[in-house]
């Protein structure tokens, strides 16, 4: 039973959520046996592939490198995954915008059900995932020959990014599907920890009354604690902070060691 993890990366390095996805794959490995492979699909992505090869527990890295994969267009990544999909019992991706865009396409092409945002592995075919906005946990069993899974990063502790010694193998890249084109990307640069991986989060809600109060009250505290800043949906809708601050069901899923909520009801 070999498991393929689709790496989320920026062509130069592996994003932290990939380590959580590999952790889930290693639990699958423990209950069913087999190897863990990682696919890096990008352009000029040798550095990312080399970083993936160092991840603890990974036995092989598949590198698909071509211009049509540079920006992670889902149609091209999915087609490349399909070139190797039949060799795997499980295809795993982190439940990020990237993973959620690719995994359903792979599942549709394989004519199997996708299992979304798992937080625990019970056996090789049985998983747990949150439902009803996290108020209940569903146990899901799949009889499909290939399980296509997205992993909620907060459900699994990340594996070590160093210590592995996997081989890197270049694979055939599918031709450009020509169904979409990359237009632009706006990257938000923060001096603080990223919300989804932060150990400490200071979050504000509508009770703060204004964006000015949010800045005045919360930023000094976050500075002292070296914390990430978050916000409720109500605070975002009121215009206190940008959308990428939003925490929760319709925002970012977080699992800090300390969460300080100010002016948030419910």
Short names for language-model regions:
Residues 1-266:
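N-terminal glycine-rich FAD/FM-binding segment characteristic of electron-transfer flavoproteins
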